[in-house]
Amino acid sequence: MNTLHPDIDHARQFLELLDADPASFTFQTFAERTGSKEFPRILHGSLTQHADTLIKANLNGAGIFVMVNAGDQRGRKAENVRRVRAHYVDLDQCGIDPLFTAELPPHIVVESSPGKWHAYWLAAPETSPEEFPLVQKALAKRFSGDPAVNDPSRVMRLPGFYHQKKDGDPFMTLMQQGKEA
């Protein structure tokens, strides 16, 4: 019997913070748990439209991810990105304390797995996909984050779903802080 219960409302809250019109996202699933029969899949549309598919995939051992930036609904490559929603930093190797003393603290903080964090700053509407990597690299340097997280089509873990990469207990990825810009 499966006792995991992904939290769609939590996922929805996160997506609504990223975009006032959360009707159009690109979701990605990847097999995580050993023995999972799930395969990588890309889904375009709303969380409501794909909730059942994402829940089933998560319960079957897949990690659930979302392309943070707005795409054209045709793919998940840099050329598919149409609008920057947020800048973010992956703090899997360091703590989050420096975030809270920053000149501009993040709008959203997510615990992706125990003691590992993602921080998001909502982007100005005029931010172009071409300048995205420069800001990402500066954030990674400033906060000792992962410098490889700099492509505009990057997917990040979707809060409300379970992280199952390690063969231990599943961990629900949770938004620990969220506020509008």
Q: How does the language model describe each region?
A:
Residues 5, 44, 113, 123-126:
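Conserved aromatic
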